[in-house]
Amino acid sequence: MGVTELGKLIGKEARREVKLEALAGRCVALDAYNALYQFLASIRQPDGTPLMDRAGRITSHISGLFYRTINLMEAGIKPVYVFDGKPPEFKLAEIEERRKAKEKATEELVRAIKEGRRDEVAKYAKRAIFLTNEMVEDAKKLLTYMGVPWVQAPSEGEAQAAYMARRGHCWAVGSQDYDSLLFGSPRLVRNLATSPKRKVGDEVVELSPEIIELDAVLKSLRLRSREQLIDLAILLGTDYNPDGVPGIGPQRALKLIWEFGSLEKLLDTVLRGVTFPIDPVEIKRFFLNPPVTDTYTTDVTKPDDAKLRDFLVHEHDFGEERVERALERLKKAMGKLRTSALDSFF
């Protein structure tokens, strides 16, 4: 879900829209779960239901991952997908709340379909999205067959992706959420795993990749350090404390950080006596020192055409002609990445 309130404070001066091709020659660590949820939400049939194979298994995530990854590689981008591992204990309550909300949305979806309320079907279908273990394994299998590297994070995927970017093994983190900045990524690229067009109300708007640099964010918000950015996010709400501090909006939160300098000082003064479901200092410590692994590679490998055909066409009923055309595109794009000076990739 991410730190959406913090995103509202990040102004245009800290954001830079670019063409996809401007990222050519860059390695980007993509938040795999974030991307898969986007594919499940956006790749749907006219009635709002996801794509499925003949066995009734959802394939929207497979389709989105396959074709979008090829698009990124054709633009010269080297993607590395990072998958979530075990969430921190203090996130479990929030995960349970999300599960209940999805179950409720599923009930509303069934009711809307039965009653023929087609205008509401798409709305509830998106809210009812579940990312199952089978879907995650499908994604990993597909990437392996494509020759695209993926990394299993020990905990939060964005924490691992940010770690890889901090070490210089990737140039940026790719996600719609802002959490990677809190985890220390030097830069975030948004709108990478999305369709270049999105419907907003009755209009279709173009979505360009958007680069947000950590240093630019700190400068624009007049913050001295990443620690202060974390403090600000905790006041506003994160994945671990989505409600933030009741009664404190973005502008007041920013002023409090300017005035008191740290979350700890606020807890000793203005916020003394406030009850928190989760210790905010524990959340801060997690952002500063999350579990990460050094066991990963960013190297691309040769695609396995036979396994891709079997997985996509025979197992999941993708159209054979379209898959063959995509395989040719993949091989050409992969060839450029593998024969270019790979040391130019971070």
From Swiss-Prot:
The lineage of its organism: Archaea, Thermoproteota, Thermoprotei, Thermoproteales, Thermoproteaceae. HAMAP family: Fen (MF_00614). Its EC number is 3.1.-.-. Residues 1-102 are annotated as: N-domain. It comes from the Archaea. Its cofactor is Mg(2+). Structure-specific nuclease with 5'-flap endonuclease and 5'-3' exonuclease activities involved in DNA replication and repair. During DNA replication, cleaves the 5'-overhanging flap structure that is generated by displacement synthesis when DNA polymerase encounters the 5'-end of a downstream Okazaki fragment. Binds the unpaired 3'-DNA end and kinks the DNA to facilitate 5' cleavage specificity. Cleaves one nucleotide into the double-stranded DNA from the junction in flap DNA, leaving a nick for ligation. Also involved in the base excision repair (BER) pathway. InterPro entries: 5-3_exonuclease (IPR002421), 5-3_exonuclease_C_sf (IPR036279), Flap_endonuc (IPR023426), Flap_endonuc_arc (IPR019973), HhH2 (IPR008918), PIN-like_dom_sf (IPR029060), XPG-I_dom (IPR006086), XPG/Rad2 (IPR006084). Residues 120-261 are annotated as: I-domain. Mg(2+) 2 binds at D177, D179, D239. The gene is fen. Interacts with PCNA. PCNA stimulates the nuclease activity without altering cleavage specificity. This is Flap endonuclease 1.
